[in-house]
C-alpha cells in the first residue's frame, strides 16, 4: 500500500507547457457527471435515461451515465463488443445473471453477451457509468435480433433531446472526440 502523505508535496512541480499535440482535441471535463438535473438525461427507454459524457463516432463508442429513478428496463440486447460498467448508486442487474450491482460495483461484459438490463426499486436512483462500444443489437423475447442501435443513433437521439430541452446540440457535439 502506498504511504499516506499529508502535504501536497507536488506544489512546486511546473505543469507541462505543451499539453496537446497539434492534432489533439482537449479533454472532455464534465463536473458533476451524475447530476440530478434531468435535462441532461436523454430518454433511452420509457423508464431509463442516458447522460452522454463522451462520444466517438469513428470508434462507434460512447460513455454515459445510465439512470433510472425507479424500476427500469432497457430492452433485451446483444453486445458484439465489450462493455464496462461502474455503479454510482442504486441497484441494477441482468435478468440472465444471478448478481445484482449496487454502489461501488464494477461489471465487465464480455463480447458476445445478450441480456436484459433491469433497474430494481431502491431508495437511490440507479446511476451507472458505462463505456459502450456499439452497436447494440436489439433482441426479441426469444433472443433473435430485430434491430440495432449504434453511435450514430445515439448522437441523433442526444442532439434531438438537448435541442428540445434548450441545452442545444452544440453541447452534444462538444463531447465528440
Go through each PLM region and give its residues.
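A short hydrophobic beta-strand segment most commonly corresponding to one strand
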Residues: 85, 107-109, 123-141
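Short acidic-glycine-tyrosine-enriched beta hairpin
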Residues: 57-59, 93-119
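Glycine- and acidic-residue-biased ligand/ion/polar-headgroup-sensing regions
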Residues: 69-71, 79-96, 102
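A short, N-terminal "cap"/entry segment at the start of jelly-roll beta-barrel domains
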Residues: 1-60, 146-148, 156, 160-177
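Small beta-barrel nucleic-acid-binding modules, principally OB-folds
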Residues: 60-69, 74-76
Amino acid at each position: 500500500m502506498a504511504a499516506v502523505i499529508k502535504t501536497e508535496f507536488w506544489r512546486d512541480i511546473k505543469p507541462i507547457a505543451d499539453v496537446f499535440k497539434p492534432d489533439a482535441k482537449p479533454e472532455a471535463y464534465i463536473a458533476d457527471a451524475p447530476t440530478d438535473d434531468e435535462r441532461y438525461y436523454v430518454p433511452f427507454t420509457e423508464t431509463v435515461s442516458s447522460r452522454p459524457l463522451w462520444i466517438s463516432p469513428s470508434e462507434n463508442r460512447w460513455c454515459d451515465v445510465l439512470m433510472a429513478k425507479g424500476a427500469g428496463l432497457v430492452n433485451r440486447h446483444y453486445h458484439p463488443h465489450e462493455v464496462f460498467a461502474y455503479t454510482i448508486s442504486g441497484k441494477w442487474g441482468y435478468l440472465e445473471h444471478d448478481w445484482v450491482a449496487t454502489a461501488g460495483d464494477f461489471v465487465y461484459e464480455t463480447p458476445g453477451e445478450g441480456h436484459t438490463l433491469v433497474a430494481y426499486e431502491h431508495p437511490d436512483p440507479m446511476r451507472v457509468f458505462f463505456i459502450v462500444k456499439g452497436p447494440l443489437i436489439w433482441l426479441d423475447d426469444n433472443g433473435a435480433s430485430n434491430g440495432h442501435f449504434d453511435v450514430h443513433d445515439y448522437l441523433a437521439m442526444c442532439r434531438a433531446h438537448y435541442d428540445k430541452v434548450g441545452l442545444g446540440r452544440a453541447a452534444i457535439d462538444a463531447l465528440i472526440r
